[in-house]
């Protein structure tokens, strides 16, 4: 089971909602098969951590390169993001 709910907006654009009640261990290191851009729809204290980097706030647009390991670090409240897959 995925740790988010997803709504498809177009072929490459999605809204994802990560629930605050999801256990932190569900947010595992992973990599994606395409470049992506994420942007939080609402202010948040959730963070994203890329391989070999310190966690950073999800502010503005965040580029996630294809095949780079990354993970979310849970904050307070739900996280609602706009996700664009650069395919």
What residues fall within each predicted segment?
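Ligand-binding loop in jelly-roll beta-barrel domains
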Residues: 65-87
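Short, conserved beta-strand element in jelly-roll/cupin
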Residues: 31-46
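Conserved short histidine dyad/triad with adjacent acidic residue
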Residues: 13-32, 63-67
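Short acidic-glycine-tyrosine-enriched beta hairpin
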Residues: 50-69
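Beta-strand residues in well-ordered beta-sheet regions across diverse protein folds
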Residues: 41, 48-49, 73, 82
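Transition segment at domain starts
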Residues: 1-18
């Amino acid at each position: 089971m995925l740790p988010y709910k997803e709504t498809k907006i177009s072929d490459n654009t999605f809204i994802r909602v990560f629930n605050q009640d999801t256990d932190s261990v569900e947010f595992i290191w992973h990599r994606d098969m395409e470049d992506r851009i994420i942007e939080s729809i609402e202010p948040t204290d959730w963070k994203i951590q890329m391989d070999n980097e310190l966690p950073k706030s999800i502010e503005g647009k965040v580029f996630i390169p294809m095949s780079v390991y990354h993970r979310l670090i849970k904050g307070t409240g739900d996280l609602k993001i706009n996700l664009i897959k650069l395919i």
